């Protein structure tokens, strides 16, 4: 059952900042989690960093925070596992619910949802690691090869030429069993935050 949190702007909250974990994005998450906890402290809240591990459920229950701030990147933090755990523990948290997280973390599932909504996206195919490394032409250049689940651009390779494609063998150990191969679309990356259905700010990268 989802847990809500009602509070006033001047309330002092006990907040557990959940970060770290075991995904390839662990270090990014730890750095972000510390900055978030520091910022919450400056706002007057009681914030503590919790590094996700096997004991985290017991730790969170003992802390009984007013809110869990999900600062995890990738893996269990974004695929719905952390959301499911926090639902079971009956703790209020930031982040999407289980279903939205699990779909959003999987780039292929996300594309199927986008297609059902009539939203355009780059041409793509899903290949095994062996197919990617076979040196066969998989798509007209340029294209992008990326993990199906993952973020922070870890494991992402933009391929502009045959020689760059052949160089992928150097990264063979880091490639996943199934990879997304996607048409390269040049442009500027922008992120827009949406809260309660309202856009609250856009950043350009």
UniProtKB/Swiss-Prot annotation:
The keyword Cell inner membrane does not apply. Residues 111-205 form the ATP-grasp domain. Its main location: cytoplasm. GO terms for cellular component: cytoplasm. Signal peptide: none annotated. It comes from Anaplasma centrale. PROSITE patterns: ATP_GRASP, DALA_DALA_LIGASE_1. Its cofactor is Mg(2+); Mn(2+). It catalyses: 2 D-alanine + ATP = D-alanyl-D-alanine + ADP + phosphate + H(+). InterPro entries: ATP-grasp (IPR011761), ATP_grasp_subdomain_1 (IPR013815), D-Ala_lig_Van_CS (IPR000291), Dala_Dala_lig_C (IPR011095), PreATP-grasp_dom_sf (IPR016185). Belongs to the D-alanine--D-alanine ligase family. GO terms for molecular function: ATP binding; D-alanine-D-alanine ligase activity; metal ion binding. This is D-alanine--D-alanine ligase. Binds 2 magnesium or manganese ions per subunit. The keyword Kinase does not apply. It is found in: Cytoplasm. Keywords: ATP-binding, Cell shape, Cell wall biogenesis/degradation, Cytoplasm, Ligase, Magnesium, Manganese, Nucleotide-binding, Peptidoglycan synthesis. GO terms for biological process: cell wall organization; peptidoglycan biosynthetic process; regulation of cell shape. ATP binds at residues 139-190. Pathway: Cell wall biogenesis; peptidoglycan biosynthesis. Cell wall formation.
